[in-house]
Amino acid sequence: MDDTDLQILSHLQRNGRLTMVELGKLVGLSSPSAAERVRKLEDKGVITGYSANICYEKLNKHVTAFILMEPKSCKHYAAFATSHPDVAENHRITGMYSYVTKVVTESVHTLEDFIDTSMAHGKPTTLVVLSSSSCHPAF
C-alpha cells in the first residue's frame, strides 16, 4: 500500500460517493487507474463497504451517550445490546469494563429507560455526550 492508496482511502472515508473521475483528479490518477486501485483495495478487504453518515437529530434522536458496562454475562449483554433499537455501536473492550455501548435516543427519559433495562444485564456507567467533532483516522 503506497501513499496514493492512503490518499484514496482518506478521500473515500470523507466522501464515499466520489466518482472515479473526481477521485482520480484528487489523487492525480486517471479515472480507470483510480477505479482499479479502489477495486484492489476492495478485493484485499481494506475497503469493506460504504455507508451513509446519519444526522440523528433529524430522526428526533437528540441524546447520545456511551454506556460502560460490567455485565453479569457478556453473551447475554451482547445479545441485548445488538437487539436494542437505540444501540448504534457495541464494542467488547479490555479493562475495568467489558463493553462500551453507544446509545442514540430521543431524550433523557428514553436514555433512562435504556439504563434501567440494561441493569438487568449488569452495572452500567453512563457518559452523556455534550458535543462532538468530526474526526477521521489518520493513515
Swiss-Prot record:
Asked if the Swiss-Prot or TrEMBL record annotates the protein with the keyword Transcription, the reply is yes
Q: Name one Pfam family in it.
A: AsnC_trans_reg
Mind listing where the DNA-binding region sits, in residue ranges?
A: 20-39
Q: Which PROSITE patterns match?
A: HTH_ASNC_1, HTH_ASNC_2
Query: Record's PANTHER family?
Result: LEUCINE-RESPONSIVE REGULATORY PROTEIN
Protein name in the entry: Uncharacterized HTH-type transcriptional regulator YezC
UniProt-listed InterPro entries: ArsR-like_HTH, AsnC-type_HTH_dom, Dimeric_a/b-barrel, Tscrpt_reg_AsnC-like, Tscrpt_reg_AsnC/Lrp_C, Tscrpt_reg_HTH_AsnC-type_CS, WH-like_DNA-bd_sf, WH_DNA-bd_sf
Q: Which gene encodes it?
A: yezC
Q: Where is the HTH asnC-type domain?
A: 1-62
Keywords, alphabetical: DNA-binding, Transcription, Transcription regulation
What is one cellular component GO term in this UniProt entry?
cytosol
Checking CDD domains in the record gives:
HTH_ARSR
The record's GO molecular-function terms, alphabetically, read: sequence-specific DNA binding
**From what superkingdom does this record's organism come?**
Bacteria
Tell me if Transcription regulation is a UniProt keyword of this record. yes
Q: What does UniProt list as this organism's lineage? A: Bacteria, Bacillati, Bacillota, Bacilli, Bacillales
Any GO BP? response to amino acid
